[in-house]
Amino acid sequence: MLKIVANTADLIGDTPLVRLNRLQPENAAQVYLKLEFFNPSGSVKDRAAYQMIIEAEQNGLLKPGSVIIEPTSGNTGIGLAMNAAARGYKAILVMPDTMTKERINLLKAYGAEVVLTPGEERMPGSIKKAKELAEQIPNSYIPMQFDNTANPDAHRKTTAPEIARAIEEIGKPLGAFVASSGTGGTITGTGEALKELFPDITVHVVEPAGSPVLSGGKPGAHKLVGTSPGFIPPILNEDVYDEIIKISDEDAYTTTRRLAAEEGILVGPSSGAACFAAIETAKRLSPDKVVVCMTADTGERYLSTDLWSFI
């Protein structure tokens, strides 16, 4: 059916689920990937960005002429830049200088100003700089995705109900939900709501083996962009997940490449990591169950990285 909408915000959500075929393990639960690159700016973060802006407007924190400032690893910033452009706000996004060229250029394409901070400072450095800018710029507002309850709320309101409707259509019980974690918004909001709807499911959070902060380890370098900011975000509900799955850069990269070459699904490395974890989770469940895995963004944002250096 042809979809005609009033603005880009109406295109956020209702992303499709696609079944794994060639990567599907035998005698295991069926894995479905929820393709968040179908959102208008290409990632799951469109959901949180829109919800944070709407709630800020409702609470009088954003008014005509306001400036949105946000520390971001990229996807939330892109979602905020898109929504800011559509709603008439200026956006300033602060990010580590290790982020991909594609992300930086996308932000600029949406009319946003980009401020880069030293990569070795990771997200805490970008957060500090964003707060400094907010003190200097009048009528500015930091949504602060790591603290903002609108972030998980977006997934309670949209992502989880979408998955529930899909499970009803598939006709098999949901056995597990798998997602990576950056801010914690997706795993918290979706996980909480799905456990209310499907009390018997397990929730599995993915983090990079090189920066196992959720597992109690120290932050470190890794290639799963958008995950493990180097600290445990305040909005993350650590009780919602039943298992933390640590994924190596190598396994994430291999799975990401296989998804493109064998399934025709081009996603980013954090999605490859989540898919690897979903496949391993599915092997522990019976074939009459379903595993839903969130894929955070499009792989087009990573074509300049070593993920695709062999091309």
Swiss-Prot record:
Q: Which GO terms describe its cellular component?
A: cytoplasm
Main EC class of this protein?
transferase
Report the transmembrane regions from the record.
none
Give the keywords, sorted. Amino-acid biosynthesis, Cysteine biosynthesis, Pyridoxal phosphate, Transferase
Q: Does the keyword Hydrolase apply?
A: no
Describe the reaction catalysed, as an equation: O-acetyl-L-serine + hydrogen sulfide = L-cysteine + acetate
Q: Might you give the EC number(s) for this enzyme? A: 2.5.1.47
**Residue positions where N6-(pyridoxal phosphate)lysine is found in the record:** K45
| Cofactor annotation | pyridoxal 5'-phosphate
Q: List all disulphide bridges recorded for this chain.
A: none
In terms of domain of life, where is this protein from? Bacteria
Q: Name one GO biological process term.
A: cysteine biosynthetic process from serine
Q: Which InterPro entries match?
A: Cys_synth, Cys_Synth/Cystath_Beta-Synth, CysK, P-phosphate_BS, TrpB-like_PALP, TrpB-like_PALP_sf
Q: Where does pyridoxal 5'-phosphate bind?
A: N75, G182, T183, G184, G185, T186, S270
Residues making up the signal peptide according to the UniProt record: none
Q: Name one GO molecular function term.
A: L-cysteine desulfhydrase activity
Q: Which NCBIfam families match?
A: cysK, cysKM
What family does this belong to? Belongs to the cysteine synthase/cystathionine beta-synthase family.
Record protein name field: Probable cysteine synthase
Q: Which organism is it from?
A: Bacillus subtilis (strain 168)
Ranked from the top, the taxonomy reads:
Bacteria, Bacillati, Bacillota, Bacilli, Bacillales
